């Protein structure tokens, strides 16, 4: 089934999608203003991403028609999305917003971002994207943002610790388990990686890689599979790793997690391209330069991958100048000068063709023991097609986090995904949507 078919309108409206049907309202692309060829005016831009103030300044310096005023907001987990949603609802939100891919369908379903079709030069932007990156921002025939980064999920390892255990970088999940056992034997008390209860998007990525489809449609109904067969396989596998003490349950980015990386208690990270900066920050003082390497995810028998994280830029319903806002969104996501202006703010891997080398040049990767960007590129080429995010990610995310909180007191990952399945279905039904399981 083509992606556009997955979002066919439940109310029979040709331009509608199941997302927009969630609330019964939404932006009508037919009524969106057609931009002038050279839009002008003042716009506002909100983002929690580091360095975006520099990008806004570079855009302002590059032309004199549009003036961007930038405001830093907290990231989504720390209230950024609540602030954004409240402001848009009140009619005083920014012209341009930053929304991560799992959360975007929720903003679309609430009618809080507008389609960019007719506002952007699609042949020069959207049409140059891969199908996998288009799928992150397109619903039905409409484009509700332009993707900034396309974050391939990867593993990070201490190569010196693998060498001490006498193991190569695992290529399959079976090999990963065996590597963990050998690490235990060589270095008692060491863990090959950690399972992070607060990183639900990582669980989604691991399930995605295995072929899971947490959201889809069946006729005019949403089909929810947060505990589908592929997810159950992944849940059972990782529970086994926890039980065998191959991986440690710990909150990502916590003091405990950071100390475990610094002192060698945990020698691997389930992450993405953007993990590089955090790993370096937590391990550099321990003399680990040159020891950390990136690697493609172990697989289930054939090459497969997933995205983990990443953000889009969008024009909000609040915008009084959507043409100028869309012009700025194009600059943010397709112009090399935007990447240069942001500078060395992390190991970005970008969605638009040709921009990643610019980001790579700005980032100093000498801390790492292999060609990390080469690994990112390989992982990006294995993304499993067919994944889509649903319109109530908050329900799924909260339910999984809460259930994962019981993993150290007898709860299991399998129980957690079952709980999240029920919570997700209940949330969709509460929104007035038809749901099948």
Segments (PLM) and residue ranges:
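C-terminal lobe and pocket-closing loops
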Residues: 274-288, 301-402, 435-436
């Amino acid at each position: 089934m083509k992606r556009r078919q997955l979002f066919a309108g439940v109310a029979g409206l040709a331009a509608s999608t199941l997302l927009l049907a969630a609330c019964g309202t939404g932006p009508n692309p037919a009524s969106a203003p057609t931009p002038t060829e050279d839009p002008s005016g003042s716009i506002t831009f909100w983002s929690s991403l580091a360095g975006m103030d520099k990008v806004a300044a570079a855009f302002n310096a590059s032309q004199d028609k549009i003036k961007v005023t930038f405001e830093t907001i907290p990231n989504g987990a720390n209230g950024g999305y609540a602030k954004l949603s409240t402001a848009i609802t009140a009619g005083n939100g920014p012209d341009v917003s930053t929304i991560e891919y799992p959360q975007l369908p929720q903003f679309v379903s609430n009618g809080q971002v507008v389609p960019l079709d007719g506002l952007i030069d699609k042949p020069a932007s959207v049409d140059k994207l891969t199908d996998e990156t288009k799928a992150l921002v397109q619903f039905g025939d409409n484009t509700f943002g332009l993707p900034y980064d396309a974050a391939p999920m990867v593993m990070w390892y201490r190569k010196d610790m693998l060498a001490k255990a006498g193991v190569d970088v695992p290529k399959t999940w079976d090999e990963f388990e065996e590597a963990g056992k050998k690490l235990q034997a060589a270095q008692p008390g060491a863990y090959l990686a950690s399972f992070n209860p607060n990183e639900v998007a990582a669980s989604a990525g691991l399930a995605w890689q295995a072929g899971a489809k947490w959201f889809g449609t069946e006729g005019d109904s949403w089909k929810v599979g947060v505990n589908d067969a592929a997810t159950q396989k992944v849940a059972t596998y990782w529970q086994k790793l926890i039980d065998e003490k191959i991986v440690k349950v710990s909150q990502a980015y916590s003091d405990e997690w950071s100390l475990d990386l610094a002192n060698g208690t945990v020698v691997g990270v389930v992450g993405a391209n953007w993990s590089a900066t955090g790993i370096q920050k937590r391990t550099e003082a321990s003399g680990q330069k040159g020891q950390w390497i990136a690697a493609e995810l172990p697989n289930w028998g054939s090459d497969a991958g997933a995205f983990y994280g990443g953000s889009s830029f969008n024009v909000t319903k609040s915008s009084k100048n959507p043409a100028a806002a869309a012009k700025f969104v194009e600059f943010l996501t397709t112009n090399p000068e935007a990447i240069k202006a942001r500078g060395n703010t992390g190991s970005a891997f970008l969605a638009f063709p040709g921009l990643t080398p610019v980001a790579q040049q700005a980032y100093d990767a000498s801390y790492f023991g292999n060609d990390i960007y080469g690994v990112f590129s390989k992982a990006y080429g294995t993304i499993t097609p067919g994944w889509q995010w649903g319109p109530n990610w908050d329900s799924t995310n909260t339910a999984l986090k809460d259930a994962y909180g019981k993993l150290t007191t007898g709860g299991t990952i399998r129980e957690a995904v079952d709980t999240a399945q029920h919570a997700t279905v209940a949330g969709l039904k509460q929104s007035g949507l038809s749901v099948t399981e």
